[in-house]
Amino acid sequence: MTDKRKDGSGKLLYCSFCGKSQHEVRKLIAGPSVYICDECVDLCNDIIREEIKELVPHRERNALPTPHEIRQHLDDYVIGQETAKKVLAVAVYNHYKRLRNGDTSNGVELGKSNILLIGPTGSGKTLLAETLARYLDVPFTMADATTLTEAGYVGEDVENIIQKLLQKCDYDVQKAQRGIVYIDEIDKISRKSDNPSITRDVSGEGVQQALLKLIEGTIAAVPPQGGRKHPQQEFLQVDTSKILFICGGAFAGLDKVIGQRLNTSTGIGFSAKVKGESEKATEGELLAQAEPEDLIKFGLIPEFIGRLPVVATLSELSEEALIQILKEPKNALTKQYQALFNLEGVDLEFRSEALTAIAKKAMVRKTGARGLRSIVEGALLDTMYDLPSMENVGKVVVDESVVNGQSAPLLIYSKPDAQVSGE
């Protein structure tokens, strides 16, 4: 490599590609009788990157996984929710098959199938969407429906969702149009009341109306910097009909709406059949019977429900399922903490009764799988604080008493004569 000096013969050196002298560039790289400057190297890299981007969609189309393959991958990361995984696998496969073959097949227009996930907090709605996007290697972004408002009001515009998706793929419109958008807390934008009000519902029905076109498919004009504060900027045109929208929510109280409908259909008065405690359906069983009319009664407008034709319900996770979640998935929580401790050169062991205690705590808190990390973090906090300052610790053992806060983890030292229990 040469610097900005003449060579041994006193001759001024020039880039063989752009013709700039060594005084006009930062570096010249020498080859056999040729030179290339740093600017030309950067330009070559940009050209190669652009060509690779053009090849990616073709490669993705040829590698579209089958519903069985999608389901198998979800099984590696998500415990339970078998029906929801099957529904998602088919819907995602059909969506990307539609993109691969265009919007029509033999003259038949293929409709867009967005997805609605209904299930309690911590049941795996967000994890399913994230895992799908990661497996398919497509851009993914999340939005919180509670922060969205109608255009012109304080809050996020619905177009900001697409702007976030563009950010995830460096404003590559073609790549963004193959992405997945997950809108969480969709139940929180339900209509506040069935009765018309003088006060405009800018965060409820108004947001549903604003989301309609975006979810169904429209050409969204999105500024690179987001918002409407810079109208002079050139807007990016994004076709949202190619983006898969997955909406999720807990829909607290929907089970009661469904229960009322089912009870009404069994008769009233003396002809009504009174069910015993053993015959009463669980919340998960009721949610699985959700119909569009129930969602309308809950507060979603009919047009919005029509844009989400694929509905999958997730049941509340049992204690056994939570124990499986702790130890079985590829990125299970216990495996994550074991990897963290291994970075300190220490083994970490969770005894079976400890996993049961963690699951029981999560059940009491009603936080589902989402609450598992905070419980494990609380049990290991003091140990993780002290461990980097300690020497000769070879293993840390967590049992039920540690999870319940009755004792500290058992520390096993690498020296045989130095085994102690927690302080």
From Swiss-Prot:
Q: Which SMART domains match?
A: AAA, ClpB_D2-small, zf-C4_ClpX
- Using the record's annotation, list all stretches that form the ClpX-type ZB domain: 2-56
Q: Name one Pfam family in it.
A: zf-C4_ClpX
- Spans traversing the lipid bilayer: none
Q: Does the keyword Nucleotide-binding apply?
A: yes
Q: Where does Zn(2+) bind?
A: C15, C18, C37, C40
Q: Which residues form the signal peptide?
A: none
Q: Which organism is it from?
A: Photorhabdus laumondii subsp. laumondii (strain DSM 15139 / CIP 105565 / TT01) (Photorhabdus luminescens subsp. laumondii)
Q: What is the role of the protein in this entry?
A: ATP-dependent specificity component of the Clp protease. It directs the protease to specific substrates. Can perform chaperone functions in the absence of ClpP.
What the entry lists under HAMAP family is as follows: ClpX
Protein's UniProt name: ATP-dependent Clp protease ATP-binding subunit ClpX
Q: What's in the keyword line of the UniProt record?
A: ATP-binding, Chaperone, Metal-binding, Nucleotide-binding, Zinc
User: Which GO BP terms apply?
Assistant: cell division; proteolysis involved in protein catabolic process
List, alphabetically, the GO terms of the cellular component aspect: HslUV protease complex
The residues the record assigns to binding ATP are P120, T121, G122, S123, G124, K125, T126, L127
Please name the GO terms that the record assigns under molecular function: ATP binding; ATP hydrolysis activity; ATP-dependent protein folding chaperone; protein dimerization activity; unfolded protein binding; zinc ion binding
Q: PROSITE patterns given for it?
A: CLPX_ZB
Its gene name is clpX
Q: Which Gene3D superfamilies match?
A: 1.10.8.60, ClpX chaperone, C4-type zinc finger domain (6.20.220.10), P-loop containing nucleotide triphosphate hydrolases (3.40.50.300)
Q: Which SUPFAM superfamilies would you find in this protein's record?
A: Glucocorticoid receptor-like (DNA-binding domain), P-loop containing nucleoside triphosphate hydrolases
Q: Which family does it belong to?
A: Belongs to the ClpX chaperone family.
Task: Share what the entry says about its subunit structure, partners included.
Answer: Component of the ClpX-ClpP complex. Forms a hexameric ring that, in the presence of ATP, binds to fourteen ClpP subunits assembled into a disk-like structure with a central cavity, resembling the structure of eukaryotic proteasomes.
